[in-house]
């Protein structure tokens, strides 16, 4: 049967025969750098682009009329692309300014409901890997208490729907609609959007004064162009489009009864696979795990939320932000971390991950050496944990990470490693053995054939490390003033103001990550950016007495910000040269000019706390320094 490869949240799935350096998939390990293309443009790919969850969202005649009303309205004050945590936070923070009403906002998403990554990802074992008390947005505002320290996928998805209900956003959402292009009309001071409806609605034209790209960092599932992929006769799917018709079960009750007599192969051992493998081990007749680079897996220690303890946690105003920033400090500013570790998880015992997200003092002499020493000790403990749990020493060696901990996002799970003790689980090590290829009945590595009834391709997502523009990551062709394509600006030496807006793309906002702050808790980052963007938009409206206006950074301001980003990066990016898998940066492979351009495309390397201080200081001045604001006639 045809592979059940599905489209991403903007209609694409990633299959490509060439890597970034121009080598073919056969010349390199194809799990490294496959790039996305739209398989929906091919006849054979059309069946793979379906939303596997759309049938759960019944569309009444009233709902259809509401959607048609939003389209007929045509012009909207604010267009938000994306209905995940980012889109919700941008909408809520705009409403809280008092300068925007609910009818000013239009949210567009290809999904049939709210949730973003938690809408699409519904694989068995799905949970967040950051404490839910700081990861789930707007808990203080909603008063909701998470059921567990690490919330499940269904709970996270339900929370997104809850937020949309409390703020009345559902009636302002245009679902099952993919924005394909955004074009700036300078004469009208508006963004013109071309969208493709995926249900009864077909091509849609929209207009907006402001546009916000909030499609997330990991919106696009990535599948390498494995040789022979299209010849395989069994079902193939990505975890982000889990096919329960093949496995049995549901997201809420993932009892995969249809796998009891099946040979299952899962390719990849990243964050998704770490959660999936224990579930497959329980339900499959035979499970084969294909690994290129092992994940560093520490314990998670999940538990149910104690109500009495929750009352203590959520008892004071501002508690969630305080807890978020306490968590951030233990990773991004370890030398000045508070006396009390509020979260107390395994993330907060990994300050060396600051080499990825940035930290106070990261460019100072000796910082990298100090982090390498700390990381070496931690990685040694991770390897010891593998050998303590996995009975077979040779298998334990294969599962042990031998690279700096900042090279690959760490994982946390209590059952993953133990799954490799089960007699029905095999581990296939791909290191030094060439690439995977598909046969009609399974997979092949070098001269060895692996028969499989089902293949799950857990090869991750298009990463922000790819240094592409917000438009490219969202699969939207964005064209600014004078026909300037956003991708061209990113390639030719990026400049932004605060990582959220860029000149010649007026009234357009995006949540970094280039030239903005980042942290391991993406919800905190998104909330800070949403607050900042809401402030800029509201102040611009106020300055123009509520009239239509255009706002963008001055050339000098965004150049100065880019220079600050480069200055704060220093030589910190060289830490990634030791990474064995695809890295953010490798000095050995880049010219001096390329290194400088990479530095402009990186994040605020001084850490999220420093970045937020910069934003708050800028806002406290109240002058909107560096912005050009013009009222339209």
UniProtKB/Swiss-Prot annotation:
Coiled coil regions in record: none
Transition state stabilizer, annotated site positions: 409
Keywords annotated in UniProt: FAD, Flavoprotein, NADP, Oxidoreductase
Top EC class, one word: oxidoreductase
Entry keyword Oxidoreductase: yes
Residues binding NADP(+), per UniProt: 127-129, 269-275, 292-293
Pathway: Secondary metabolite biosynthesis; terpenoid biosynthesis
Positions contributing to FAD binding: 117-120, 129-130, 135
Organism: Emericella variicolor
Effect of deleting the gene: Impairs the synthesis of anditomin but accumulates andiconin.
EC number(s) reported in the record: 1.14.13.-
The protein, known as: FAD-binding monooxygenase andJ
Cofactor: FAD
GO biological-process terms attached to the record: terpenoid biosynthetic process
Cofactor remark: Binds 1 FAD per subunit.
Pfam families: FMO-like, NAD_binding_8
Transmembrane region(s): none
GO MF term (any one): N,N-dimethylaniline monooxygenase activity
Similarity comment: family membership: Belongs to the FAD-binding monooxygenase family.
Function summary: FAD-binding monooxygenase; part of the gene cluster that mediates the biosynthesis of anditomin, a fungal meroterpenoid. The first step of the pathway is the synthesis of 3,5-dimethylorsellinic acid (DMOA) by the polyketide synthase andM. DMOA is then converted to the phthalide compound 5,7-dihydroxy-4,6-dimethylphthalide (DHDMP) by the cytochrome P450 monooxygenase andK, which is further prenylated by the prenyltransferase andD to yield farnesyl-DHDMP. Further epoxidation by the FAD-dependent monooxygenase andE leads to epoxyfarnesyl-DHDMP.
């Amino acid at each position: 049967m045809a592979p059940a490869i599905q489209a991403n949240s903007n209609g694409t799935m990633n299959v490509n025969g060439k890597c970034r350096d121009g080598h073919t998939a056969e010349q390199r390990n194809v799990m490294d750098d496959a790039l996305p293309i739209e398989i929906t443009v091919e006849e054979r790919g059309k069946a793979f682009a379906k939303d596997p969850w759309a049938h759960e969202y019944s569309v009444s005649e009233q709902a259809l009329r509401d959607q048609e009303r939003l389209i007929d309205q045509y012009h909207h004050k604010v267009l938000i692309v994306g209905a995940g945590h980012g889109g919700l936070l941008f909408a809520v923070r705009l409403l809280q300014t008092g300068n925007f009403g609910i009818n000013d906002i239009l949210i567009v998403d290809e999904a049939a409901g709210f949730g973003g990554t938690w809408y699409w990802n519904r694989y068995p074992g799905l949970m967040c890997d950051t404490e839910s008390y700081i990861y789930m947005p707007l808990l203080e505002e909603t008063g909701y208490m998470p059921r567990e320290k690490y919330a499940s996928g269904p709970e996270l998805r339900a929370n997104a729907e809850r937020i949309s209900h409390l703020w009345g956003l559902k009636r302002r959402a245009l679902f099952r609609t993919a924005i394909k292009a955004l074009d700036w009309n300078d004469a009208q001071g508006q963004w013109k959007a071309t969208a493709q409806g995926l249900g009864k609605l077909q091509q849609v034209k929209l207009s907006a004064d402001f546009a916000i790209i909030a499609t997330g960092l990991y919106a696009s599932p990535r599948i390498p162009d494995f040789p022979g992929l299209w010849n395989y006769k069994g079902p193939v799917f990505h975890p982000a489009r889990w096919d329960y018709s093949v496995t049995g079960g549901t997201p809420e009750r993932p009892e995969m009864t249809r796998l009891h007599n099946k040979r299952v192969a899962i390719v990849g051992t990243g964050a998704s696979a770490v959660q999936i493998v224990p579930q497959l081990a329980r339900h499959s007749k035979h499970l084969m795990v294909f690994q290129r680079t092992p994940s560093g897996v520490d314990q998670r220690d999940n538990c149910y939320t104690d109500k009495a303890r929750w009352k203590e946690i959520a008892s004071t105003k501002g508690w969630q932000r305080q807890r978020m920033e306490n968590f951030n400090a233990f990773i991004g500013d370890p030398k000045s971390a508070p006396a009390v570790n509020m979260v107390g998880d395994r993330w907060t015992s990994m300050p060396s991950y600051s080499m990825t997200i940035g930290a106070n003092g990261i460019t100072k002499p000796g910082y990298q050496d100090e982090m390498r020493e700390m990381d070496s000790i931690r990685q040694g403990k991770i390897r010891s944990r593998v050998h303590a749990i996995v009975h077979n020493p040779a298998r334990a060696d294969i599962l042990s990470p031998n690279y700096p901990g900042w090279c690959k996002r760490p994982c946390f799970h209590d059952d993953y490693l133990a799954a490799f003790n089960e007699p029905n689980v095999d581990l296939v090590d791909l290191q030094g053995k060439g690439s995977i290829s598909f046969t009609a009945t399974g997979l092949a590595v070098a001269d060895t054939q692996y028969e499989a009834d089902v293949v799950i391709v857990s090869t991750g997502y298009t990463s922000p490390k790819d240094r592409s523009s917000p438009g490219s990551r969202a699969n939207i062709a964005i064209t600014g003033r004078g026909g300037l394509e956003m991708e061209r600006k990113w390639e030719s030496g990026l400049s932004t103001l605060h990582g959220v807006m860029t000149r010649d793309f007026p009234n357009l906002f995006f949540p970094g990550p280039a030239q903005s702050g980042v942290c391991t808790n993406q919800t905190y980052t998104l909330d800070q950016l949403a607050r900042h963007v809401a402030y800029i938009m509201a102040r611009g409206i106020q300055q123009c007495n509520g009239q239509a206006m255009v706002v963008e950074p001055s050339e000098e301001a965004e150049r100065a910000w880019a220079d600050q980003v480069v200055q704060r990066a220093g030589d910190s990016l060289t830490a990634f040269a030791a990474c064995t898998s695809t890295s953010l940066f490798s000095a050995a492979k880049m010219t001096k000019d390329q290194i400088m351009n990479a530095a402009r495309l990186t994040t605020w390397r001084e850490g999220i706390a420093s970045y937020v201080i910069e934003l708050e200081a800028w806002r406290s001045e109240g002058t909107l320094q560096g912005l050009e604001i013009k009222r339209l006639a």
